[in-house]
Amino acid sequence: MEEMKVTKFPEGFLWGSASAAYQIEGGWREDGKGITNWDQFVRIPGKTYKATTGDVAVDHYHRYKEDIALMAEMGLKTYRFSVSWARIYPEGRGEVNPKGIEFYENIIDECLKYGIEPMVTIYHWDLPQALVDLYGGWESEEIIEDYVNYAKTLFKAYGSKVKYWITFNEQNIFTSLGWLTAQHPPGKFDDQKTFYQVNHHVFMAHAKAVLAYREMGGTGKIGASFAYTPSYALDCKPENVMSKHDYDELKNFWWMDVYAYGRYPKAAMNYLRKKGFAPVVTKDDQKILKAAAAEIDFMGVNYYQSCVCEYNPMDGVTPYGTMNTTGVKGSAQVLGVPGIYKNPGNPYLMTTDWDWSIDPVGLRYCCREITSRYDLPIIISENGLGAFDKKTEDHKIHDEYRIDYLREHLKELGKAIEEGCEVLAYCTWSFTDLLSWLNGYQKRYGFVYVDREEEEGATLDRYKKDSFYWYQDVIKQDGENPVSYTHLTLP
């Protein structure tokens, strides 16, 4: 395709930013909220950076009006946030907590007051611990009906005000880190059989929630958000090209095909059957998945990096090794699946301090792949740069590196739209700084700096970074040729 300038984004394009309940709210035991799996997991020694918790987080629970006013000042068109299941149902089921319903209604109303479209994520990893204690959480198919009941409660409470619903955030990530690497709850290691069955339970919960939304007369848009890591073959050696294909089958299409087609990729399922890892899928399940696939309105994409695929011999690297959770650049190990693929670094790309490749073209690749394979509209539900931001003595945060990162990604997203991809929204991760699940508060993503570190007791005051003013300008210009940092006018 020929080189092009970035023209204005489509009329009605939703310029947004995102967050997650556990990472920002705090108020972990206030107003009747139940305990979540994360409230318990972070209290296990060694599980989080410097034993950080979300007990207070960045105190959005008490400061949401201040935060949403800043969003309005920036000019956001949409705010993507998640609901904490345990705030609505403290025990995961049973009695609804009216204070929980009221809190999220207040957030929705505050957004609408400023003309900001609320985009609601139903599940962003924080599960009522009561359901884990009762039947094992996602390991039991019993959770499907509890999740659907919870989702229906949200549809009933907020359906007249919310037009965009995301059933699950990054199903591929919370299940992988929970049942394969033990880095997320329930902290299980290499439990592949359970991992795939858990994923099937999540798929069924997603599908039944989508169908319930339609049965209840929901006319908004609904789908799931997937952490998409596009892959490149190391070279044109056939073994490496096949490793890329196998990677996509097992790491990308295994999820997206179910959302969009209602079926699992055949080659991946055959492989899992041979290994004894394939989930139990009934004919009724297949019908429900297929019916829901016909009802989703978009594919949500959380994009941070791409990867390289190379054939991995049987005695090669495994999926389990050191992941960089400290920000010490170069500490991550090459991982892979013996006999299939490994993911070496890309010599053509820079990396973040957490060893994530920086690849703006990869975002365009994602959009093109989804458009060609699924012919679905796209919501970029997360994209952003985690970095060590520093506040100067006069309370300025000069994050030109974040501006450069987002600017280059938006240029490629604009090209994807010019090439025929239907993109509805772009949500950065994140609006304010927040708790990074494994990296504490040192890994900052926001346009708004929050005065806190790993230790409690800071002011939690908010300060606008340089990137705040840059994104404000992008929104005013509807994304047309976003300016570089050197051309940015700062107050």
What is each residue range found by the language model?
Residues E2-T48, E91-R93, I101-S484:
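Active-site region of glycoside hydrolase catalytic domains
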Residues A18-A20, S82-A86:
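Acidic/polar N-terminal loop/beta-strand segments that form early-domain functional surfaces
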Residues I35-A69:
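Aromatic- and Gly/Pro-rich amphipathic surface segment
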Residues W85-V96:
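Glycine-rich, proline-tolerant flexible connector loops at the mouths of alpha/beta enzymes
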